[in-house]
Amino acid sequence: MEPMVAPVKPPRSYDSTERRRRAQQQHEITLRTARTLFDQDGYTATTVDAVAASAGVSAATIYKSYGGKSGLVRELCRRALEGDGPTPAQTRSDALRNSPDARTIIEGWGNLAAEVSPRVSPLMLLLRAAAVNDPEAATLLAEIDRARLRRMSDNARALSDAGHLRKGVSVHEARDVLWLYTSAEMYELLIVRRRWTRATFASFLTATMTALLLPIGSTTR
């Protein structure tokens, strides 16, 4: 009599799609939780352990996924810079460089700055406050500032190459004007302190950058 052989069970199918969905969902929860705690308690007082406990994950998971607290802020800043629309703000900004009309470019950049400032500037201001005593925050703040300055340099170069800059305005001067007027500090002064609306802020940025960068007589539509 032949020995009985237990039937071989087929391997369980592993739903990798569901796993990715759950991981992405947890990723979103973690980032929302971190943003809430940073806004509520500040950068220094918010700990990885606090974010982990509120998000329902382990601190080890946060360190593995983001590298720590500064990594959370870096990812939050990256997302904030995408803006409100389905197309990331930086992509829309790059596309504006191809416009033949300098006024359209400046107006578009002014609108984009007003769009992303309420999302990213509070994070920058948190880092600025923490950077005085926190080397990690200072390092991240400097990293983000350098990246923004490079981007403004690229924008200024695009204006110059297209012949849009007013005579006598150098690429470096244009870069610094763009860098200043799209800064978190400008957002803090006018929207946070003076309670300007986003629309008013956008109009101000557009009018001011037009007056400083474009040929005299250029006006926004």
Regions found by a protein language model. Give the residues of each.
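Hydrophobic/aromatic-rich alpha-helical bundle segments in the mid-to-C-terminal region
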Residues: 160-208, 216-221
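N-terminal intrinsically disordered/low-complexity leader segments
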Residues: 1-25, 217-221
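Hydrophobic/aromatic residues within well-ordered alpha-helical segments
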Residues: 26, 69, 80, 109, ...
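Hydrophobic alpha-helical connector segments
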Residues: 69-71, 75, 86-118, 175
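Helix-turn-helix
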Residues: 29, 33, 37-71, 75
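Short, basic, alpha-helical segments at the C-terminal edge of helix-turn-helix-like DNA-binding modules
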Residues: 48, 77-84
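Helix-loop segments that flank and shape redox-cofactor active sites
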Residues: 50, 98, 129-135
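Amphipathic alpha-helical packing segments from all-alpha helical-bundle domains
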Residues: 114-128, 136-162, 172-176, 203, ...
